[in-house]
A protein has these predicted regions:
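Basic, helix-initiating cap at the start of DNA-binding domains
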Residues: 1-23, 27-39, 53
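Short hydrophobic/aromatic patch on the recognition helix
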Residues: 37-48
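Alpha-helical DNA-contacting segments of helix-turn-helix folds
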Residues: 48, 54-62, 104
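Short secondary-structure transition hinges
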Residues: 91-128, 139, 148
């Protein structure tokens, strides 16, 4: 029995992510995707028009709610750590994909093919609320308006991931993200990571 359109898209998209991660986006053809997904070319073109179309599909079906569990957020000690968990998940996803494919995604975003920046800033409303709570509870000492400060945490994540991709993975992306976020927000000393925690961060 033939797969429904949505199931076929999911099957191809998951196979595509494996192929892109293992071989690199530019080295993978539509034929490779069809073979990996176990579908005919005609089936591929029934639901997608190109490799880029697969990437667009993946981005349209990804948001903060799908990458971070409520259990993780509830287990965090404070709202700053909740913001960190969300931002760090984007870092983890990029490391799982590898620096080369992450660089490809950034390139596609610059070409207007996907909205990488929009995906990250889909959490802005969360970050604004969490920032306001942190300021109220003395975790964040910066007096900048939450509406300005919260979204900057996403920008920091992009900055460090860009540096990591440019340096082919030889960059302390996680510790730099944490250090810069703490500095930007002027996080109270009691809530900052220790030197040992920063050192251990990039071993994960």
């Amino acid at each position: 029995m033939a797969e429904t359109g949505s199931r076929l898209q999911d099957t191809i998209a998951q196979a595509a992510m494996r192929c892109f991660r293992e071989k690199g986006y530019d080295s993978v053809s539509v034929a490779d995707l069809c073979e990996a997904a176990g579908v005919a070319r005609s089936s591929f073109y029934r639901v997608f028009s190109s490799k880029k179309d697969v990437i667009r599909f993946l981005f349209e079906h990804t948001d903060a709610n799908s990458i971070v569990s409520i259990e993780e957020l509830l287990a965090a000690e404070n709202d700053f750590d909740r913001m960190w968990i969300i931002g760090d998940r984007y870092i983890s996803l990029s490391k799982e994909l590898g620096y080369a494919f992450t660089a490809t995604l950034m390139s596609l975003s610059l070409q207007g093919e996907i909205d990488l920046l929009g995906l990250g800033h889909s959490v802005d409303a969360w970050f604004i609320r969490l920032t306001r709570s942190c300021q109220k509870n003395g975790v964040i000492l910066s007096a900048e308006p939450p509406e300005r400060l919260g979204p900057l945490f996403v920008d920091i994540t992009y900055q460090v991931l860009y540096a990591w991709a440019c340096r082919r993975g030889r960059y302390p992306v996680r510790s730099e993200a944490r250090r810069r976020t703490e500095m930007l927000a002027n996080v109270a000393p009691a809530y900052r990571w220790s030197a040992q925690q920063l050192e251990n961060a990039d071993r994960a």
